[in-house]
Every structure is written in structure tokens, then in C-alpha cells.
Amino acid sequence: MKCKLVNKDIRENYTNELLMERGLSPEELQYFLDVPDDSALQDPINLDYIEQAGAMFEYMTTCTNQETIAVIVDSDVDGFTSAAIFIQYLRKWNTVVNIVPILHKGKGHGLSDTYDDVINTHPSFVVIPDAGSNDFEYIEKMAQEFEPPIYFLILDHHIVEPDTHFSDYAVIVNNQLSPNYKNKDLCGAGVTWQFCRYYDSLKGTSYADEFIDLAALGIVSDMMSMLSLENRYIVHTGFKNIQNYFFKALCEKQAFSMGGKVTPITVAFYITPLINAMIRAGSMEEKERCFTAFIDGHQLVPSQKRGAKGTYEEVAIESARECTNARAKQNRVLDKVVEELEIKIAKHDLLSNKILFIRLDDEDFPPELNGLCAMKLAAKYQRPTIVARLNDEGEIKGSSRGLNESELTSFKNFMDESGFFTFTAGHDNACGIGIYDKNLSAFHEYANEKLANVDFGENWYEVNFERIAADQDIEQLIYNIAEHEDLWGQGNPEPLIHIRDINITKHDVQVMGKSADTVKIVKFGIAYMKFHAKQMLEDLAKYDVIKLEVVGRANLNEWMGQYTPQIFISNYQVEDGALAF
């Protein structure tokens, strides 16, 4: 286990100093901590073409019950929340127009796989939240299928290539295309919500306020930076005022796992995966129910619950249950697929390269699981992993996952710098990729040479605080970090603490839990905890006197009004303490 302190050695004002190390100015810091008002929100007028979008929306508000507005629902949580915000907002202004949500059958985006479905609705307008900026050819073709032509409203946040053409039939509002809009970390739901704020400003209303919780859910689920002051305001305000009935139902279902707290981390770990599982593994009927739950959660639907035939349930409650089932189903399928891929790895000696690259051929499983498979295999084999399929054009497309605890801090940057990939889209250690099959061998040669001295089996941590167990300020450090638990998220990760010289005997090791696999060690008033720790128990049992080193995260345990400072252990190193004296 290797650790590197990535900021200055902070010995006071722990959270404040860390946030300034991460780029906040003193003025920004105070706002970030307190969120006293909405001054961090940018004026939506800074989004290019928003006035034209408002004019198009004005026409939508006048559509009759003989007209249709098609809304394409992108296939991720940001897509669902973006479309849900738009539809509910439009309903504030027009209760009669026929609004048709169109869901992707797979993990598609924009018009690429929804073209025929949209055409069949004979729409007057097509709205594409969280996608569509790159759909020039589809828009041009579809617009002219009708006379008069149909028009498109695109509310997006994705990066657009410099040579992209834009159709005269579309109004595109995109923060990436708006030089005056400074927050490039706003997601599709955020852009959609800002559009609603703009229209409110024209009409003297505040309907958009009702949907800030969905904008917050989209921001967290799409892994946008939580260091952005605007994102901080939206997420802080949205999670404090959850109004969407389905979002509430999901939080109630996951309340135990979330510890009753709605924060960027608890939502990312316990809410987003449920919705993603439904999008990936649910039937079309179940996915449609899930989206309906977002826009009309109190609607009664026939219960699909075993033993409840002939009864009705609110769709938000029904879909929350189905999302949980979809997660379990997805995990079962995933386990089976990973087993099959492990056979392929062994058969073709794929571990001979520094990058585990699995080119799929005949494997029959949904491409929506590529990323999850890559994540599981990367964790098991402790190396960056790509799971991808070869298409008819000779290009391999799929998903990559790097290791967060390794010397290779950005697998995405590594692939970009190699020059072999046609695209990498996503985050440092989780992104979609494309590479021509003819370049695969050359990439392996490049990677094997560049990474020859990198030991992916040895965990490597970028830590924010380093201490020895006897340091007097560890308790204060834990309290300070834990009381700011709603700050941490993507781009502003929960601080890692590295503690050395925890000198104990085997009698200091407490074994807890129903499965007797939870470790608790108390030293100098700090409880060091690790769950599912059978391997750690074996390692600790080797010695009578133990020198322990840990990397972990701060936690405050509350019981009957009493608080215990804890470190939740991420990783550890055990040495024979008898040799240390």
C-alpha cells in the first residue's frame, strides 16, 4: 500500500483549508459552506439561443389537444430527470396538448435509435433534453418528412465537435456552446431547469423551483463536479426540499442504507444505481412505468407484485419496488456474464497485457452491462479494463474502467495520449471508448511499454491527511470532516486519511456483526472499523503484537446521544509489531 499526500499538510481548519487547496477562493469557500442564497446561480440568459428557445416554447404552450409534442427520454438518470422536468413544466402552461415521452429500447442517445418512433407520433415539435446537439443529419431528414416541417428544441450539455453542423430546424441550448455561461459542469437536467427559470422570468412565475430536486438528482447521477458553486447551490437546495414523489419513494426505500441522510454520496451510492438498473435491465413496460413515476407518481397502476393481482398501487411506489428488483436481476445477470468472461480471459491469456482488453464476439448480453462488467473485472484482476464489441466497420466500441487506487490516476488521459482511440467520452476512470481493431495490437505494445513499471496489484492512494495514531488532533479532524458530509461528491471527493503506527495486540481486535466479519479496533479514543473483513481478520491473527497502518474515511457514530469518532478503513497494512521495537 502506497500513499501520497496530494495537498499541503493541513493541521487546522481542516475542511476549509482542504477546499481552498482544491481551488476555492476565501469568498467562494464561505458561500460553499453556508449556501446563504441563490447568488451562485447564473442568469439563464447567458445560455446562447435561450431567447429563441423561449419563443419556441411559447408556441408549445398554445398547442391544442389535436397536436403532439414528442419528448425523447435519454437512457440514463440525467435523461430521465431532464425529460421529467420539461414535461412537468410544460404541463404548468398547457394541460391539453398530447405529450408523448419516447424511451430508448437500448442505451441509445438522441434520435439515432428513436427516429421511427418519433415519426409515428406525427409531432408538431420534438424536444430532446440531455442529448441531440450532434444529431444534425437526423434532424434535417426528419424535419422535412412533414409539411409544414417540424421543429426541434434541444436542451443539452454534451461537448460538440468543432466541425459540427447545426440545423435551421433546431434551437440548441447547450452550456458547452455558450461562452458566457461559465459552469461547464452543468448536466442536462441542469440546463433544462435553467431553461424553465428563463421562461419563469418572462412570465413572473416560479414554477421551476418545484423541480430543483430533479435537477440535483441529475447533477449527482451524471457525476458532475460538486466543486462548482452553481451545482453546490442546486444540489444543496434540491436535496433539502425533495418534492418529487418518486424521488421521495426511492429515498424512503433506501433510508436504512442511506442512514436517513440525503447527500451527494448517499444518492450516488443508493438511489442512482436503482434507476440505472431499471434503465439497463428493466422491460420496456417497467421503464415506461419508471418514467411515469417521475412525472405523475400518484397515478394508480395495476400492481405487478406477487400475490397482489387485481389491486392497484401508486406508480411511484410500484416502480420503486420494481427498481429494487431490477437491481437484483441486473446483478444476477452480471455475475453470470462475468463468469463467462473469466473463462475467456483464461482461454486467451488476456492477462498477459497490462491492460485487460476483452473484445466481445459471440457473447450474448446487453451492451448496457459493458461498463459494469469492466468495473467488476477491473476490481478482480486489479488492472485497467476495457469491455467492448467489434462492429461491422472494424471499430471496437465499449466501456473502460480504471483503478481509482493506482498510480495511473486517469485511464482516460492515458488512452487519449496513446493516439490510438477514435474517442474517449466520460470520466478519468470510467468512460466509453472506440478503437479500430487494426490498432489494438499496437495499443497493447504501447501500454505494455509505458506501464511496465506500474504494479496495479499494489494499491496507491492519494490522501489528504497524514497522521500517526498518537496525534492529538485526529478526533477533531474526524468531527470537522464528518459534520460537512453534504459537501463531498464528484470532483470534491470525501477526504482520505492515512494513519500509521497503530500499535495494538491481538486482544485489541474486536469481532462484530451477525457474520462475525466486522473488525473494530479502538486506539486513543478512535474506533477503526472495517466491514466484510474476513481477510483482515486472518492478517491480524498472524501476530500477537501488531503494527497497523490504514487508509480510510472519517465517520461519526451516534448512539443514544453519544458520538464516537471512527475511521472506516478502505485499506490496511499489517506488520509484526514485535519487530518494530
Protein language model features and the residues they cover:
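Hydrophobic helix-and-loop "lid/oligomerization" segment in the mid-to-C-terminal part
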Residues: 2-125, 143-150, 200-448, 467-469
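Short beta-strand/turn micro-motifs composed of small residues
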Residues: 73, 130, 156, 389, ...
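Conserved phosphate-handling catalytic cores of large alpha/beta enzymes
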Residues: 116-119, 126-145, 151-215, 224
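Active-site proximal loops enriched in glycine and acidic residues that flank catalytic Cys/His/Asp
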Residues: 130-131, 359-362, 389-390, 400-402, ...
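Nucleic-acid-binding small beta-barrel platforms of the OB/S1 family
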Residues: 192-194, 405-408, 574-581
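A contiguous loop/helix-start segment that scaffolds small-molecule binding in enzyme catalytic cores
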Residues: 239-240, 244-248, 449-538
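OB-fold single-stranded nucleic acid-binding module
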Residues: 431, 439-443, 470, 546-581
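Short nucleic-acid-contacting surface segments enriched for D/E, G, S/T with interspersed K/R
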Residues: 535-551
